[in-house]
Amino acid sequence: MEHYISLFVKSVFIENMALSFFLGMCTFLAVSKKVSTAFGLGIAVIVVLGISVPVNQLVYTHILKDGALIEGVDLSFLNFITFIGVIAALVQILEMFLDKFVPSLYEALGIFLPLITVNCAIFGGVSFMVQREYNFPESVVYGIGAGTGWMLAIVALAGLTEKMKYADVPAGLRGLGITFITVGLMALGFMSFSGIQL
């Protein structure tokens, strides 16, 4: 149990997808204007990462890995296309669910919901799972932890962005300029966790 807790904490704080690896920055910067929208997208990323990482772990272990299907047959060259297909299918299911049951969040996310399919944080989570050779329970914990870390970062940035609306930001830094500086300072803050050994 201790191993899974340390893996979760490590994936949320030490190896944060957005602030340590800078993955998923397109939606991270675009949807960080309001806390409510950022929170909704963060939940969607947790769901997609929490399901796609373990599902892709099963697909990789039982089908794509060298000798998994048939002895001597290596299908690992199909990793990228298979992983993207699984992620796209999960995002489509999530999109239909939100459209049916939470239409306000579906409208608020707009074009960024389908963009989760090509969000490099999602694919990065799956790639790290393969690279680090996580088993199924580890991939579940890692997927949920990585999604939680990404959500924590985007909600924090959205909160800071909402506060900066009332600040006297110099004209040359308004918009993306101050956002990049803020993200850089947040990344420096999260870098302080890198010395922790779990």
Swiss-Prot record:
NQR complex catalyzes the reduction of ubiquinone-1 to ubiquinol by two successive reactions, coupled with the transport of Na(+) ions from the cytoplasm to the periplasm. NqrA to NqrE are probably involved in the second step, the conversion of ubisemiquinone to ubiquinol. One of its GO terms (molecular function) is oxidoreductase activity, acting on NAD(P)H, quinone or similar compound as acceptor. The gene is nqrE. GO terms for biological process: respiratory electron transport chain; sodium ion transport. This is Na(+)-translocating NADH-quinone reductase subunit E. Keywords: Cell inner membrane, Cell membrane, Ion transport, Membrane, NAD, Sodium, Sodium transport, Translocase, Transmembrane, Transmembrane helix, Transport, Ubiquinone. Coiled coil: none annotated. It comes from Mannheimia succiniciproducens (strain KCTC 0769BP / MBEL55E). GO terms for cellular component: Gram-negative-bacterium-type cell wall; plasma membrane. Belongs to the NqrDE/RnfAE family. InterPro entries: NqrDE/RnfAE, NqrDE/RnfAE_oxidrdctase, NqrE. It catalyses: a ubiquinone + n Na(+)(in) + NADH + H(+) = a ubiquinol + n Na(+)(out) + NAD(+). It is found in: Cell inner membrane. It is an enzyme of class 7 (translocase). Composed of six subunits; NqrA, NqrB, NqrC, NqrD, NqrE and NqrF. It is a multi-pass membrane protein. The chain crosses the membrane at residues 11-31, 35-55, 77-97, 110-130, 140-160, 176-196. Its EC number is 7.2.1.1.
